[in-house]
Amino acid sequence: MRGASHLQILLLLVLGTRMQECAACGQPRMSSRIVGGRDAQDGEWPWQTSIQHRGAHVCGGSLIAPQWVLTAGHCFPRRVWPSEYSVLLGALSLDVRSSHELLVPVLRVLLPPDYSEDEARGDLALLQLRHPVSLSTRIQPVCLPAPGSHPPPGSPCWVTGWGSLSPGVPLPKGRPLQGVRVPLLDSRACDRLYHVGANVPQGERIVLPGNLCAGYRRGHKDACQGDSGGPLTCMESGHWVLVGVVSWGKGCALPNRPGVYTNVAKYSPWIQARLSL
């Protein structure tokens, strides 16, 4: 009986730890009220990061663990030197420094085994930071989706980043973090939209099964240049979940050309395996 009691206590401790780990992600202190194309509030998207090459912003990213950031593979050249990259965390504006910010060097850049920049396949990159970061109200990880999970089409999600407002139109002075609410689209329906006006046979996929889409058929709201690698997050059971990573699109917010994202749930097993090494 004593052995059984110890086992029960151990199980409760393990389950409690896992529940704490779950509760520690995807729950910013500031609730989101961004509906479309407005400045983010301080602490609203605490997992948002800026991937920087020699001090210049190149892509967005998401903190998924104290020492790991998820972004897009195409943000890096075929031969990458991690020492040239760093990750900015806790920032609300790229041009206005804050005492809450952290700039951490990148130790390693890991790509999925099926990554292909030419085919926009497996467009993810895991960045291991040189050291774990201390979490705060402005620096928090986002939750990863369960492997193979599929949020229903129409789910309201948010894409955030420091990208251009439209092609050739940069952010205003200070470069504040932006966010826009976009609905999820079925990947096959999205593929049909991309065939409209395209000289591509209907049987040939443009949007691959490993992708998902978000946006409006009429356009108007979308990610843009500089948002690549950034998060597409959806609220699930009271937690923000990293459903997609900004991958590619035709222009920005054009009709029949919604934003295309890498489906994070498809790569959750690979991500979790890397994090546990």
Swiss-Prot record:
Chief location bin: secreted
Localization per record: Secreted
Active-site residues, Swiss-Prot/TrEMBL: H74, D123, S228
Biological process according to GO: proteolysis
Entry keyword Nucleus: no
EC number: 3.4.21.-
Name the record gives this protein: Serine protease 33
Tissues of expression: Widely expressed.
Post-translational modification: Not glycosylated.
Superkingdom per UniProt: Eukaryota
Similarity annotation: Belongs to the peptidase S1 family.
Organism of origin: Mus musculus
Alphabetical list of PROSITE patterns matching this protein: TRYPSIN_DOM (PS50240), TRYPSIN_HIS (PS00134), TRYPSIN_SER (PS00135)
Signal peptide: 1-24
Peptidase S1 domain segment(s): 34-276
One example GO MF annotation: serine-type endopeptidase activity
Alphabetic keyword roster: Disulfide bond, Hydrolase, Protease, Secreted, Serine protease, Signal
Top-level class of the enzyme under EC nomenclature: hydrolase
Gene3D superfamilies linked: Trypsin-like serine proteases
Disulphides: C59-C75, C157-C234, C190-C213, C224-C252
